[in-house]
Structures are given as structure tokens and as C-alpha cells.
Amino acid sequence: AEVKSCISVSGNSEMLEAFELLKKALEDNNVENLEWGYRATFGGATVAMDCPPYEMYYSGSQIWQQTQDLADISGMYKAYGIAMEENATTTRWDHVAVELEFLHFLTYKLAYAIENHSEEEQESCRSGKKKFLYAHIGRWIKAFSTSVVKKTPEDFYRQAATLATIFVHKEMVRLSVDAEEIDEYMGNEPDYLQRLEGKSASACDSCMDEEKYD
């Protein structure tokens, strides 16, 4: 009810419609279906290569750029007081859920700063949001959403991806962020991520059973 109220106040009919569809998809569902739908869309023990939920798969960058981008993401989290695990080699800071949560965190901090008349904090949060939208989530959310809509058998994930894209793009317009967007996922598998995860990825875990990697 609170989320719907906030969207209604904004007067954004497109976002409100997307939220209502997401809400309905959740109400008509259960945990088992959502778990199955997640694995079918994003993979399980391995990443689904036709719909990865990680930024680095969409950038198609060289290894030096991949490590720099991941370091930049981690650095932004730390700059705003979010602690990262130092020794967890499998920690993925570029997961779409983590990046969207960070965007929510900055939005909340900005709202708090506005309410408490902190001009310096407002500028810090606004600047952080603009940078994160421009360099990270704003670049690949469209391609990610398109991949999800095409692949997922579960309407909940289709509507969630659609709502996320609408929200991110509305924020980009509001903050005058002109990111160089990736329109479509091209099936990249960055070398760095392959080594990070220990093996190549497939939409079907069983397909990986006989594959061996050094």
C-alpha cells in the first residue's frame, strides 16, 4: 500500500500500471513457482548465459576493464557506508538486485536529507545516484529487462524487470543522466567472471555435469 501510494503521488501512470501487474503476478503465485521460475530464467549453480543477472556480462569489457568496473562498484558502496566482505571471492557486487538495492539506499538517504534540510548530504546522494546511473545500472538495465521478458516463463520476473526498467529510466530523466545504454545482451562471457565462478555458465545446470575446468 505504501509503495502504491508513493507511485500514485508521483503521478506516473506507467509505473503504477507496472506495479499493479507485478502485485497481481505475486498474489497469484507461490514460493515453489518463483524458485522454479528463477532457476529457469537466471540459472542455478551456474549462470544462465542467455539471461545473466550481472552487469559485467553485458559490458563485454576486457579483463582490465572488468576488474576496474567491479572495483568502482565496490568503491561506491563503501563510500556510502556499505561494508563489503573482504575475503569472499564469489561476492558479486554487480548483481542486478544488489545494484537496485543500492539505488534504493541512495534514494532513501536523499529523501532523509531533504526532510532534515541537509544541503551537503543532499548533494552527496544526488551526485552518487547520477554517477551510479550513468556508469552502471542505467547502462544495462534495458538489455537485462529485454532478456528477462524474452526468456522467463514466470510472469512475476517479467513484471519485476519491466518495473525496474521504468523506474531507472524515470530517475535518469529526472536527474538529467544521459547514459550510454546497452540495448541488447550480446552473449558475452567475460574471462574474469568465468574464472571467478570457476567454470562457464549455462541455463541448464545438468548440462555442466561433464564439463571440466582447470
Predicted regions and their residues:
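Surface/interface-facing alpha-helical segments and adjacent flexible terminal/loop regions used
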Residues: 1-214
